[in-house]
Amino acid sequence: MATERHYSPLDRLLLQADTAMRTLLPFSGQPARPSPAIIQPDAELDEQQTRHIAGLMRINHTGEVCAQALYQGQALTAKLPQVRKAMEHAAEEEIDHLAWCEQRIRQLNSHPSVLNPLFYGMSFGIGALAGLVSDKVSLGFVAATEHQVCKHLDEHLEQIPENDGKSRAILEQMRVDEEHHAESALEAGGYRFPAPVRFGMSLLAKVMTKSTYRI
């Protein structure tokens, strides 16, 4: 029977640094699943459509950077081993989304946001603080965040042209995964945040979306 490996605080910090580099450096994240866009044909898009879709995908990419940092921060301070493992597993799935979005951004001749390091640091700190409060709050924060992401994905799917099958396939699969993460966090005992807290989180999300659409 395999024994679970126990990491020292230094080991965990080094792992966090490695994850941060793989999240922020171009083409560093290797997805476990192939991009859903692979089987979709190329679409004929005009310059304005291409620029707008690239902006939306840049927002989604930064959202995945934030999710990765959030999960890593929570995993660092989670009190129960099973909660820590759940956070780490969710972070691994977010790597897929991160890589898929970056691939699509490059295909559209654009680039990820230069603000990603800033948002990574902020999200990591929020995640670590949530984990320090309690695992229940930490899991609740995951659920609220993922529900907010699903809302953004729905809005973006309404804006992306029907003939852009590549972008739509990526966002549709992300939508399925994020909803699963949210429900799993609640089923694990996550706290359901009240409306005022969710509203505050939505305001912070708007800061991210407005700033990363162009840069």
UniProtKB/Swiss-Prot annotation:
The lineage of its organism: Bacteria, Pseudomonadati, Pseudomonadota, Gammaproteobacteria, Pseudomonadales. Keywords: Cell membrane, Iron, Membrane, Metal-binding, Monooxygenase, Oxidoreductase, Ubiquinone biosynthesis. Gene3D superfamilies: 1.20.1260.10. It comes from Pseudomonas entomophila (strain L48). Binds 2 iron ions per subunit. Belongs to the COQ7 family. GO terms for molecular function: 3-demethoxyubiquinol 3-hydroxylase activity; metal ion binding. It is an enzyme of class 1 (oxidoreductase). This is 3-demethoxyubiquinol 3-hydroxylase. It is found in: Cell membrane. Its cofactor is Fe cation. HAMAP family: COQ7 (MF_01658).
